[in-house]
Amino acid sequence: MNTIIISAVNLTEGGTLSILKSFLQALSMSELSNIYRVIALVNNKDKILYPNIEYIELPKAKKRWLYRIYYEYFYFKKISNQFDVYLWLSLHDMSPNVKARRRAVYMHNPSPFFRWKVKDVFLSKKYVFFAMFYKWAYRINIHQNDYLIVQQEWLRKAFGEMFKVDQKKIIVARPYHEEIDSKERNSVSTLPFTFFFPALARPFKNFEVICEAVII
């Protein structure tokens, strides 16, 4: 039976976990789950159990980068050889070494474009080195993909230029949001308010921009 495999062994928290949940939920309820065998490679299946989805748990992937590299470039190849894989979708940036008729990768992390300064080395030395490393992690096998998936138009252009990828192969999957009624939008309260923005503490999230926008 033709198989769709979603690799997401590194997604355990924050927005990326929400994306994984939304994707698996939509896939489990779609007609595709009746046509294809769907297998999800995850860290822990307890929080993301949906019908019509099979799970393979790989908890070591999050513990050390060596495990992650082993899975992406060696172990996943063994898994792909066990099934007739129509689509292999990697939801966490790296393009694994696999056998599949169609391959796609969701590139959600903009770290390669982080313009770090000397002060950043003192504030978050680990992240600065991570940002420099991630550019090369993205590069491996990237041209083996049929499609790249990003969230924003500027990322489509930036990744296309950085890795010399035809931008027609890069899909912009914008986050879903409900339309705001124009009457509500124009009704601005003069009362004090509390602005609550839940997010993981990551330097590349540009919290300053969000705070400046609230002033407006």
Regions found by a protein language model. Give the residues of each.
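A short, glycine/small-residue-rich beta-strand->loop->alpha-helix junction that serves as a flexible
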Residues: 7-22, 204-205
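Acceptor-binding helix/loop patch of EC 2.4 sugar-transfer enzymes
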Residues: 104-132
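Helix-loop-beta element that forms the nucleotide-linked donor phosphate-binding surface
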Residues: 144, 156-177
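Active-site donor-binding segments of glycosyltransferases and PAPS-dependent sulfotransferases
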Residues: 5, 19-26, 32-94
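A structural motif in glycosyltransferase catalytic domains
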Residues: 19-23, 27, 195, 210-213
